[in-house]
Amino acid sequence: MKISNARVYRNGRFERSSVEFSDKISAFDVEGGVDAHGAYLVPGFIDIHTHGAIGYDASDCRADEVPALAGYYAAHGVTSFCFTTMTIGEDALAQAMRNIRGYERQGAQAKCAGVHLEGPFVSYKKRGAQKAENIRMPDLDLFYRMSELSGGKLKIITMAPELDGAVEFIREASKVCAVSLGHTTADYATAMAGFEAGATQATHLFNAMQPLHHREPGLIGAALMAGAEVELICDGLHIHPAVINAVYRMFGKKMIIISDSLRCAGLCDGNYDLAGQPIVVKNGRATLLDGTLAGSSSNLLQELKNVVSYGIPLEDAVYAMTVAPAKAINSFGEIGSLEVGKCADMLLLDEELNLK
């Protein structure tokens, strides 16, 4: 198939071009094809932190429900996702790994680019919406079992670097997948020790961590000094637009836009469950019963529109949803950009950034 007269996103900018592809991209600047009438042609979005949508959650959905979830992602511009679990019990976590292990993309579905374990090695004080009774100290044996059960799909683990044994855990776990620091009370020195041990990312920056302070910069300051990649929820509820712009200016191409979406995404306001905990969604804002902000009900397509409306250039917003996350999970050789030989995961967007 060929698409012509598109504004193609390559090398961080848009250029008028055409593309020929089947499962993979075969050529650019070809003759003929479907006229895109100047629409934007961008790589498919990659969401490395999403728990679920349309009633399904990675922590408890059945294997036969994953395709429906993957279909929702694709319908909202996400062509690759990391199946993200919560802090749940070991048996439930093992079952989640088995459920995703056998998933294979079919038709109009997103690809599972890997698994993101959000916990269970997190701080009790900064657990956010993670269930307290399932929090554990770092356990390499458990980590290795989950990696094996996932069929080698483990790409990220979120953990708190201040826990007993965390530095040694990070040193070993980072040989298997990316270690992201989050849900943590860590001060600057402790966070830096985590990065020096091998951590490379920070999970949903500003949320579930100590704030940036001029006398104690905490994880946020450590992430900046370490050159770490940082996730950011851009639903307009978790982070103020001015702070999103500040993160963009500070971290540049290290910023990764995520949804942190829950099973309520794509559904109406109401009462839902989050890994065994009741949550309430009102005006799109998901909270525990005590008012603690949980994940989001958003998606990356909406968040693209959000950040562009906040003043971030479209080229850089697309980078934060494609190139940056692909590099973060060591998958840039296959996905994340439009290049000959890479997967033909592409989106056509109109001037209002709607899917065409």
Language-model segments: residues:
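Alpha-helical scaffold segments that flank or form the walls of functional sites
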Residues: 40, 48, 58-111, 134-149, ...
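Histidine-rich, glycine-flanked metal-binding segment
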Residues: 1-42
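Active-site core of metal-dependent hydrolases
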Residues: 148-267
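Active-site gating loops and adjacent loop-to-helix segments of metal-dependent hydrolytic enzymes
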Residues: 71-82, 123-151, 193-205, 216-227, ...
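Divalent metal-dependent hydrolysis catalytic cores, especially in the metallo-beta-lactamase
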Residues: 51, 67-96, 110-123, 150-162, ...
